[in-house]
C-alpha cells in the first residue's frame, strides 16, 4: 500500500517501517503464530496515533494496536498496520496519591509504572508474570489477571475509565454511568444508549449463561451491561476486547497500597487430587495467592 506509507511518512514524526525486515520483527509475538503486517508505525504522541489511524482508515487499512507482544494466542499479529504503543506512548499522565489512582498512556510497561509508584507507597496490583515487558494497554485488552487476582481481581476490577478512539475517529470517554444518559459525554451518548439497550434486552440470557468465575478472560464482557446494584461502567466493555472495539489512548487505574509484611505457607499433599480438593478450603482463609507446584 504505497499510498499508506507515503502519507504516514509525510504526516508523522514517529517511526514508520515498511521494509520486510522491520515488518518481520512484528510478524510474531509470544505465540507460535506468524502473520506479516502491512507496515509498522511507532507514534511519538497520542495525537500522532490518532492521525495514523485516520490515515489508515482513509487508505482502507485495518489497524492493530500492539504493546509488549507478550500475548500467547496471536492477539498482536495480523495483516494490518501495527501501531506500536510501547516505544513512545509510555507516560504517567496524572497521579492522585490521596485518591490512589493514576492515568497512563497505553504503552507504559507494568514494572516501569510500579517503579514510579513505589516512592508514593502505591502499586498497580495486577502482577502478571510478564510484568517486565507487558504494557497496561495490552493488559486491559487481554483482561489480565496475575498471581494475586484472588485479592485484587483482574484488570476489569482495577480500571476506572478509558479514553479511546472509535473506528470512525471519534474520541470518547468510557467510564461509570448512572441511570441518566444525559451524564454521558455527547460523542458517546448514542453508542451508550445502544449498549444499555443490549444489556437490558439480553439480561436474562447473559445472567443464565455467563460463567460465574472470576478469571474469565474469553469473549466480550457483555455482563458489564446488565443492570444491577452498581452503576454500569462502559470501560469494562473495552477490557478484554483485544483492541477490536476501540484504540485506548488514556487509561485510568485504581491503585493499591504497597504490600507490608508477607508470609509464605507450604502444604504437602499425598496426591495431585488431594491438593486440588484442598484448594477450596485454603481460599476461604483469604490468602493473597495460592500456587500449585
Residue ranges and their predicted role:
Residues 41, 83, 162-164, 267, ...:
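Preference for bulky hydrophobic residues occupying beta-strand positions
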Residues 8-9, 56, 63, 117, ...:
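A generic structural signal for well-ordered alpha-helical segments
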Residues 1-58, 68-100, 129, 152, ...:
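N-terminal flexible segment immediately upstream of the FAD-binding catalytic core
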Residues 3-10, 15, 271, 284-293:
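Non-catalytic terminal accessory/regulatory regions of metabolic enzymes
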Residues 92-93, 104-286:
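FAD-binding subdomain of flavoenzyme oxidoreductases
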Residues 22-25, 71-74, 130-137, 219, ...:
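A glycine-rich phosphate-binding loop feature that marks nucleotide/adenosyl-phosphate handling sites
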Residues 63, 265, 288-290:
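Hydrophobic faces of well-ordered beta-strands that scaffold small-molecule active sites
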